[in-house]
Amino acid sequence: GIQRVEILRGPQGLMYGADAGGVINITTRTPDDGLGGQVSAEGGRYGTRQFAASIGARSEVGDIHLSASDFSTDGFNSRTADTELRDDDGYDNTTWHGRLGWTPTEDLRLGLVVRDVQGENAFDSCFTVDTFAPTDDCADDYDQQAWRVSADYRSGSFSHQLAFNRSETNREFFSEGASSFATEGELTSVSYLGSLQATDSLTLVYGADLETESIDDGTFDEERDQDGYYLELQGGFSDALFVTAGVRYDDNEDFGSYTSYRLSSAYLLPLASGELKFKGTVGTGFRAPSLYEIAYNGGAFAFPPASDTSLAEEESEGYDLGVAWSGGGGLYLEATWFDQRVKDEIFFDLAGFSGYLQGDGEAESSGVELAAAWRAMSQLSLSANYTWNDTEASDGSPRVFRPEHLANIGLAWLPLDERLQLGANLRVSRDAVNTDGTPLENYEVLDISASFELLSGLSVYGRVENLLDEDYEEVPTYNTAGRAAYAGLRYRF
């Protein structure tokens, strides 16, 4: 299961690659000592079914974790433009995941991670293979295998991590049952991450990643290397000031070299019954067009203007400044100003669906994020966040499908000695625009959830998504789910 989700804003190129324009860092749970796991089953509207199981064990010499899940839904008609078939567009996904760790000594850990994902998806609006006529009988199959082996070693003030990663991805598209487009992709990388604890307050982080990717769609068969090297200095001065400064150099076989940087700082100040934190980051990034984007523009289903577009690299720069306060009474407040710019942005043609296009100039997103959380009492918690996002594409128009105002309000209530858990979340979207600049309709979506522990480790749970049955579109002509109820049973041991 997931233990923690951390969202990192802006360019994060040092350790995550120069093309990381933001990172969602998901930390999975490590098994406690001994044996543990869970099984669950749920179902609901649209013929939705999900079964999942996981088991893990941990001791002084190692740990193991295995999980599997199977999800399927009949779905609903995905596009309003589908007025002939009007069929449900379903989705199926089966995922297997395994993690094995061995600690032969206190200073050495060896790890192995494997993952297999298979998915099938039905959708609308594609073209027939023989006549290139529009059709809504469309589907695609997705199959990915990935694995990683790693070794972590500590020696005094030094730590080292060496890892080998490989993934193979196959994807095939169908129109009216006939194969229309297929790709086979591979990604192989070797990475090294090292650190030196120079003093109690100063750490040096350094590393390299050597990556080779390839794609074959039957007519486009290419391979590309990209090597990256980085260095970061992390300092903590007294118990109040923390700073980082880093630089990264990337060498892309097709698009040349690029140097990026990232700086960050945080200052802590006691205030009232809590702590005030001032923080800020600034950084740059670089992204070469992917082999898939290049292959698509050169394929049979691309047409002008995308087929006439020779994609080049895009560059980004961004910064954010924020202040946060954590109080002893369970109150948390945060405000952040952000500004991110992308030069020569690569994007899919959402107006004509011709393929991938590239902006000429800078695209910008800037604004304010506000967040608050309050534990009103031992069994009641409230949370809220709001984003004002002022966007501008390279041609001066607003960036499409991005709400200028987006807010969430959440409530969690745990009565009955926490055996019963109740939750609600309201999502509000305002002032997004279509590809032609016309405004999209504003909407509010309310979700509720509940769970009850029947016995120790055994819980029944349920949720209703879109409780008020809001009829809305996040992307024009694409339907969204109406009111949908789901219920399930979970056992933890």
Language model feature labels by segment:
Residues 1-36:
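A beta-strand signature from Gram-negative outer-membrane beta-barrel systems
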Residues 54-58, 67, 103-105, 110, ...:
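Conserved C-terminal beta-signal and adjacent last beta-strands/turns
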Residues 118-120, 126-129, 219-222, 253-258, ...:
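Surface-exposed extracellular loop regions of Gram-negative outer-membrane beta-barrel proteins
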